[in-house]
UniProtKB/Swiss-Prot annotation:
Oligomer status and interactors: Monomer.
UniProt-annotated location(s): Cytoplasm
NCBIfam families assigned: infC (TIGR00168)
Membrane-traversing stretches: none
Chief location category: cytoplasm
GO CC annotation, single: cytosol
Pfam families found in the cross-reference section: IF3_C, IF3_N
Task of the protein: IF-3 binds to the 30S ribosomal subunit and shifts the equilibrium between 70S ribosomes and their 50S and 30S subunits in favor of the free subunits, thus enhancing the availability of 30S subunits on which protein synthesis initiation begins.
Annotated signal sequence range: none
Keyword Transmembrane helix: no
Protein name stated in the entry: Translation initiation factor IF-3
Length: 195
């Protein structure tokens, strides 16, 4: 018995679009390239009309009774569909969870660096997981870690909102921040406007 191949070497089967001669329905509801209804027409007559106009007969909806076809330039239609799909992929941003790690005994410069990282992640539209790591007996000072995380949330108040308040998880304390959808109006600016 010959050994089984590890993977299928055949090219994937491409699903060809139902255009022109590939349409097998005898009766079709035909729509003109301008959007005008031509009515229910025999398939051969619809193909003749499309050929006279030097356009393609494209099956738009085969679930309708009779199936709906449109006379159009298929190459242009395909290009526009690909362009729309590409734009949709561009606009859909997958939000990721980025992590900022620190110890509760963090120096000022290191803290500022973590704030800068968090701001960069939030501006990119990602959520931020702020983690304070405990080593050994440091876990006894979880109140200091909570204070640090709340200070961080306060410093990032303009760019983010707290999604999950600080809580202990094993030997870490974590807090989740998500990007602020509406800009925060500072209380100081409100006080100046009222005066």
């Amino acid at each position: 018995m010959p050994p089984r191949p590890r993977f299928d070497r055949r090219a994937p089967v491409r699903e060809l679009p139902n255009i022109n001669e590939r349409i097998k329905y005898p009766q079709l509801r035909v729509v003109d390239s301008d959007g005008k209804q031509l009515g229910v027409i025999d398939r051969i007559k619809a193909l003749e009309i499309a050929n006279q106009r030097e356009l393609d007969l494209v099956l738009v909806s085969e679930k309708a009774n009779p199936p709906v076809c449109r006379i159009m330039d298929y190459g242009k239609y395909k290009f526009e569909q690909e362009k729309k799909a590409k734009e949709a992929r561009k606009k859909s941003h997958q939000t990721e969870v980025k992590e900022v790690k620190m110890r509760y005994k963090i120096d000022k410069h290191d803290y500022d660096v973590r704030i800068g990282q968090a701001v960069r992640f939030l501006k990119a539209g990602d959520k931020v997981k702020c983690t304070v790591i405990f080593r050994g007996r440091e876990i006894q000072h979880s109140n200091l870690a909570e204070t640090l995380l709340l200070r961080m949330a306060n410093d990032l108040e303009e760019q983010s909102e707290v999604q999950q308040r600080p809580k202990r998880e094993g030997r870490n304390m974590i807090m989740f921040l998500s990007p602020r959808k509406t800009p925060l109006i500072k209380k100081e600016e409100d006080a100046k406007e009222n005066n």
